[in-house]
């Protein structure tokens, strides 16, 4: 009942706004296509809830996740920026901070010979936009962490004329 009456009220509101917008647009001679798009976006913005739920205190979620407590409480994580891929010249993947967990016990699977582990978090890598976000997430979950600072490469000064200098070993004679 409430959903039906809400949609009727929303529909009436949109028709009223459209009538007002059509009256305003007929004077300024703007195409009606932009009117429909803007009215639809306005209706979308009204229906979406932009409230965020924040929890200030640390909650114990070990019973909800199903992960054993020894895997959650005694973790050590590494926070770092990944190195640039040597196969490409771009630096797009070096903008985010990554968090990966320490390696726990592993063993060789006797059937297939694969490396096995009982740790559900060992292969998980989390991505953060800033180092502070990663540190606060680790502190919120009670994990100890190591931070590897971003390595900024020093640019080497090169000149085109150095390729043709006679006192360097850049030219190889054939004799």
From Swiss-Prot:
Signal peptide range in chain numbering: none
Keywords: Disease variant, Electron transport, Membrane, Mitochondrion, Mitochondrion inner membrane, Phosphoprotein, Primary mitochondrial disease, Respiratory chain, Transit peptide, Transport
Alphabetized Gene3D superfamilies for the sequence: atu1810 like domain
Phenotype upon changing residue 173 to A: Loss of phosphorylation
Subcellular location: Mitochondrion inner membrane
Membrane topology, from the record: Peripheral membrane protein
GO molecular function, one term: NADH dehydrogenase (ubiquinone) activity
Transit pept. (range): 1-42
Family of this protein: Belongs to the complex I NDUFS4 subunit family.
Function noted in UniProt: Accessory subunit of the mitochondrial membrane respiratory chain NADH dehydrogenase (Complex I), that is believed not to be involved in catalysis. Complex I functions in the transfer of electrons from NADH to the respiratory chain. The immediate electron acceptor for the enzyme is believed to be ubiquinone.
Disorder this protein is connected to according to its UniProt record: Mitochondrial complex I deficiency, nuclear type 1: A form of mitochondrial complex I deficiency, the most common biochemical signature of mitochondrial disorders, a group of highly heterogeneous conditions characterized by defective oxidative phosphorylation, which collectively affects 1 in 5-10000 live births. Clinical disorders have variable severity, ranging from lethal neonatal disease to adult-onset neurodegenerative disorders.
Record text on subunit structure and interactions: Mammalian complex I is composed of 45 different subunits. This is a component of the iron-sulfur (IP) fragment of the enzyme. Interacts with BCAP31 and TOMM40; the interaction mediates its translocation to the mitochondria; the interaction with BCAP31 is direct.
PANTHER family for this protein: NADH DEHYDROGENASE [UBIQUINONE] IRON-SULFUR PROTEIN 4, MITOCHONDRIAL, NADH-UBIQUINONE OXIDOREDUCTASE
UniProt name for this protein: NADH dehydrogenase [ubiquinone] iron-sulfur protein 4, mitochondrial
Organism field: Homo sapiens (Human)
